[in-house]
Regions:
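Periplasmic-binding protein-like
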Residues: 120-123
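A short glycine-rich beta-alpha junction/loop motif
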Residues: 4, 88-96, 106-109, 129-152, ...
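Short, solvent-exposed loop/turn positions at domain surfaces
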Residues: 18-19, 57, 169, 303, ...
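Short coil/turn segments at secondary-structure boundaries
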Residues: 20-27, 46, 126-128, 198-201, ...
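Sequence-specific dsDNA recognition surfaces
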Residues: 6-21, 35-65, 206-246, 263-264, ...
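A short beta-sheet element
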Residues: 33, 53-116, 231-298, 302-314
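Non-catalytic DNA-recognition/assembly elements of restriction-modification systems
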Residues: 1-16, 143-159, 174-216, 220-231, ...
């Protein structure tokens, strides 16, 4: 049996304090800002602090373990539970804090799962004010209606979702470890590419690969296109024509210049991305990709604001060229690890789909 209640009837909703940046110190009260509230968790990137001696003065804005925090500006509707390790912490302006009034009837973990749903975030976005930047009011939150079952049912739902989330994190960690294994195998087989400690022959890029400029995709873009369209950050659409052949590497011409992508199929690259086609008898695509992964392209950056590379500079990069037999050996290692990754990715996708279906079932 569920009942609909206004959030303000079951929660105290707190607004944050306008901490002054000129009063930041090296350590003390951690300030929880909009940037710390990400989808599903509270991140601790670039921490800012206030003097610990002001803790009594700021007592109305001091946070507690498991406070449910919500972003009220920008990416509105993102929520996370505050972990104990981030205390003592103060609530900054435009971050909301939700505290349960009666824990005998409502679980904060249940509300966290509820508000971590797509439907809640969509409602927040649709009910925000502002054009350039979205702003969500705590008054709207107070009147937001939530569907609450009895406490036992809340706990059952939470436990079910937590199990799936843990399984998802486990699979993500397995993928991370397999990716790290490939990188460590690259170093073990080929050594340090910067030092060339294994004394491989050295060539210029112009001798071992072809750089293909990207082009505007408008004339070839098609919803039913056969070939993926890549920017420097990944797939952005599909096309009925291609520029680069299979087993080529993408690096950014502008923007994301230090994030190479290995593409196994033919593809169209846009004008902000270079396609690198290895000359097969000299260099393998797996080797080229990991060379690019470990290489710092920032040294060739010609721009002040948006990072930018030129084809001329890239063609003059020196690359160690191990024997092709050794490159083939590394490719075989990658192939075997990729098989494991494929199975985990497949299982991860199924786990994610199960999680999304349950979120829709309970909170849709």
């Amino acid at each position: 049996m569920r009942k609909e209640v206004k959030l303000g009837d079951i929660c105290n909703i707190l607004n944050g304090y306008a901490f002054k940046s000129k009063e930041y110190v090296e350590d003390g009260i951690r300030i929880i800002r909009i940037t710390n509230v990400q989808r599903g968790n509270i991140e601790d990137n670039d921490p800012k602090y206030y003097d610990i001696s002001k803790i009594e003065e700021l007592k109305n804005y001091m946070l507690k373990e498991n406070d449910l925090l919500i972003s009220l500006t920008g990416n509105v509707g993102r929520v996370g539970l505050l972990p104990k390790k981030l205390l003592p912490a103060g609530l900054n302006q435009r971050v909301g804090c939700l505290r349960i009034k009666d824990e005998r009837t409502v679980s904060i973990e249940y509300l966290y799962q509820y508000f971590n749903s797509y439907n809640f975030e969509r409602d927040c976005i649709n009910n925000s004010k502002g054009i350039a930047q979205k702003n969500l009011s705590t008054e709207w939150l107070k009147n937001y209606k939530v569907s609450i079952p009895n406490l036992n049912e809340q706990n059952r739902i939470v436990n079910e979702l937590i199990k799936i989330q843990r399984l998802k994190k486990l699979k993500e960690q397995q993928l991370k470890e397999l990716n790290q294994l490939i990188k460590s195998q690259f170093v073990e087989v080929f050594g340090d590419i910067h030092l060339n400690d294994k004394k491989w022959n050295r060539n210029k890029w112009r001798d071992v690969l072809i750089i293909k400029n990207g082009k505007n995709q408008k004339k070839v873009e098609s919803f039913n296109g056969k070939y993926p369209i890549y920017g420097s950050g990944g797939i952005i659409g599909f096309a009925n024509d291609y520029i680069c052949n299979e087993n080529a590497v993408i690096i950014g011409r502008k923007g994301s210049i230090n994030k190479p992508i290995l593409v196994k199929t033919k593809f169209w690259n846009v004008d902000t991305a270079f396609g690198l086609e290895p000359i097969k008898e000299k260099i393998k695509s797996d080797y080229l990709y990991y060379f690019c992964y470990f290489y710092n392209f920032e040294k060739h950056n010609k721009a002040v604001t948006i990072p930018s590379l030129t084809k001329r500079d890239l063609l003059n990069i020196e690359i160690s060229v191990p024997p092709i037999t050794l490159q083939n050996k590394f490719s075989e290692i990658v192939k075997q690890i990729d098989k494991q990754k494929f199975e985990i990715e497949k299982s991860l996708k199924e786990t994610q789909e199960l999680y999304e279906s349950l979120m829709e079932k309970y909170f849709g």
